Amino acid sequence: MNNLCTICARSGSKGVPNKNIKKIAGKPLIQHTIEQAKKSKIFSDIIVSSDCKKILKIAEKLGVHTLKRTNQLSKDFVGKVDVIRDAAIKAQKMLDKKFDNVIDLDVTSPLRQVSDIHNSFKKFQNGNYQNLITGCVARKNPYFNMIEIKKNVLSISKRTNKK
């Protein structure tokens, strides 16, 4: 079975600039996702789609395929499904291969376990699904989970009046 893993990593984050290459536990954030994808052994191919040369260089060093994303698909308002579709179509042409499944892994989930990937894929295979999205229960309203950096200090950007 040919399963394509797409990893979409845009450079233009407003909240945490260059977050996808910031080091977390000694590695660039994107490296965690690439390593998880490789360790899962579910994917015949892994492709990183990005508009950032630094991100693409990291991906190349880690031995995965890369795709330079167009400026049009790198804007703030572009939906992720459009980017995944573009990566899948271009990967099929580039690798001369038809994929049975396309699985996208978010860069911003470094705590994801390989077992999470396995369990999600098993659920997808055993169900009658066209799509499967993972998530987790938030401890508080996600609106209040947003952070920002000001003068090299990380803080919650929205606060309630509760004490």
Enumerate the language-model features and the residues they cover.
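N-terminal glycine-rich phosphate-binding loop and ensuing alpha1 helix
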Residues: 2-49
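Histidine-centered beta-alpha loop that forms part of the nucleotide-sugar donor binding/catalytic region
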Residues: 10, 71, 136-137
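Aromatic/hydrophobic pocket-lining residues that form the small-molecule binding cavity
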Residues: 30, 84, 113, 117
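Short, high-confidence coil segments that cap the C-terminus of an alpha-helix
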Residues: 43, 97-99, 126-130
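Short phosphate-binding loop-to-helix
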Residues: 47, 53-102, 119
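Catalytic metal- and UDP-sugar-binding loop of GT-A-like glycosyltransferases, i.e.
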Residues: 105
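Conserved core of the sugar-phosphate nucleotidyltransferase
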Residues: 110-163
